[in-house]
Amino acid sequence: MVAAGGGGRAWTACGHGPARAVLALLTALLVGLLASACNNSPYPAGAERENTMFYSFDERSPRYLDPTASYANPESAYTFQIYEPPYGYHYLLRPYRLIPKSASEVVKPKYLDKNGQPLPDDAPAEAIAESVYDVPVTKGVMYQPHPAFAKDSQGRYRYLAMDRAALGDKRSPLAFEHQGTRELVAEDFVYALKRHATTRIEAPVYSVFAEYVLDLKDYAALVKTEDEKLLAKLPKDIQDKPFLDFRQWPLAGATVVDKYTWRIRLKGKYPQWSYWMAMPFLAPIPWEADAFYAQPGMAENGLSLNQWPVGTGPYMMVEFVRDRRHVMARNPNFRGEPYPCEGMPEDQAEGLLADCGKTMPFIDRLQVTIEKEEVPRKEKFKQGYYDVPEIERPEWGVKFRTDAENSDDVKRQYEARGFKFPLMTDISDWYLGFNMLDPVVGQGATPEQSAKHRKLRQAIAIAIDWEEGYGRIFRHKGGVAAHGPVPPGLFGSREGQPGFFNPVTHRLVDGKPVRRPIADAQALLVEAGYPGGRDAVSGKPLVLNYDFQRAITPEFKSENDWMAKQFAKLGIQLEIRATDFNQYQDKTLKGKHQIFWAGWLADYPDAENFLFLLYGPNSKSKASGENIANYQNPAYDALYRQLQSLEDGPAKQAVIDQMVAISQQDSPWAFGYFPWGGLAFQQWVTNGKPSILIRDMAKYYRLDPALRARKQAEWNAPIVWPMYMLGALLLAAVWAARRSYRARETATARRAVPAAGQV
């Protein structure tokens, strides 16, 4: 009995106890799984109900948000929301129309002859010695809150004379106790234009501005001399350089007329100047911000205009976590602007005029999160966690439309979820280029070398079958093969017109351009000194380096593999040197690239904006310009200078035709393709209209957070039946184990009790 009784109590403690513990553990596990399944949102609970737009950025944080230096599309997603150039573009009207932003009106230049006497508006370009723009500033415009403007009760700046200790570990302007503001004045625009003569940071459009802004070249030389004096006794690698105060030195080409008027003086006639005034390069910069960020420790703490811009626009940077997250919030000092009431005929039907006259911006916060690969970005959009995939990239609508075309199930899902993919025909291009400073593919040191290198470039240009690659294979990001540098839709472009083609890469067959056979490219390669892709003298294989501006993720690997196959047609080995965009920028600035991949989204609607990408003085490696190929041809450069003063008309067309022909023959680019464009929006995002030129789009967008919350819950409802089934199976296993264990214990107890009659 003792044994039996003892055995029974032991089973309760050592049998029921563990079973109950296991059961409790399994229950807790199931509850935890169910709870986690209820919400897979990447944001804190309740974020979907806030008036915040969520979207993503690629790979790395923007490198330059300083408006003097910033000239990359990923950076425009921030600069155009924060800064306000003098002009902008009407959001809805096409063709594009300039409208005033921080200026109170769009002004026409006054023309002067060499004696300073006024000329009529229709004066011939050769008679115009000077163009004068008197630009009125919108009154009452206030800067965002920032410690650079903060003053004490005596009117003294609180934070413009700090030492390293006073800064401490502050890494955000918002960490300072006091914030201030002030009104926008004409001096801020003059200061901004002067900054293009800086020696401290990259100034990519200095070479363009210096050709036209009166005395800007001499001013740059003066600034360089003065800066050398400031830095003379300091270590060369010092981060904390003393404040370079451009107010000290006057510039004849940019002056203050009065508090609310500034004057620009240009040499000759340059009609495109008004377009430059719609870009952040001429957005106002308060000297206080420049002085604030020049103080000791600021650079070390990541405090500069490149991370923390200071503007008058609808948004301001409130969070900058490098390579993770950026947040822009509504600028409390922004004056507000009315949503447009005028648009194209189709805009009314699309609902784009429903907010006519209402005050913008409509959205309180813009939260941008890093997403390194395309697949998770697309999935989060389909789940409703991104309102748009990326705000600045114009190809997402094409990608999603291609997915829908390839699958009826995908098409039904997209339609059921109300995704919107508006398409556009806009002005941009992608191209493969050659660094003309390179000893193998470049200009060459002698006429003989020049001829051979040109034939090598031409052979490669023939071999790359853009029609196949980006017309058929990569249709989700493709377009129409380019025959020259000027995209369709601009005056002067002949792309797509009957009889126009690139004679180097194509020939006419039945009146249509057809790519030349690979035999033509192979023959050119022989003349270039590389028969079969080998050096005719040494017999060594020709190996070329391809600098790609993105890290190789799965979606880019197939494209780069395809590109390598194009070179392999000629027996040329292509080494892929892929980097992130910031490293790519460094490499091209230093001239260390050989063959490269690049694209251009129009800054303004004029062929000149694409033809300047091959203008010699605009060299990337020599002048920090946007001529990444570092191409220089005296005939082309002379035509470009002539082009700059021409209005649309036969004379301008003739000049463009000559420039295109030169670029085709010299082949500094293998050209590429003009991409199809389209955006992607959730159903709760309204007022979305695709455009390459309009980058301050966020203020026009409107959200319906309540609808977003409902749809996110609907689209991400947890699928719990597999977990219930797993739980049932686990419970059944526990029950079976308990029953088996109990049976064994019972059998053991019976063997331990003596049989009847035994003592």
Question: What positions do the PLM features span?
Answer:
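Bacterial N-terminal signal peptides
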Residues: L23-A35
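Extracytoplasmic/periplasmic ligand-capture domains
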Residues: A37-G46, Y91-L92, V135, K139-E202, ...
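N-terminal lobe/hinge region of extracytoplasmic solute-binding protein
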Residues: S56-A125, V310
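Residue-level recognition of beta-strand termini and adjacent short loop/turns
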Residues: A127-A129, D258, R322
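Extracytoplasmic/lumenal ectodomains and periplasmic regions of secretory and membrane proteins
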Residues: D657, A661-L693
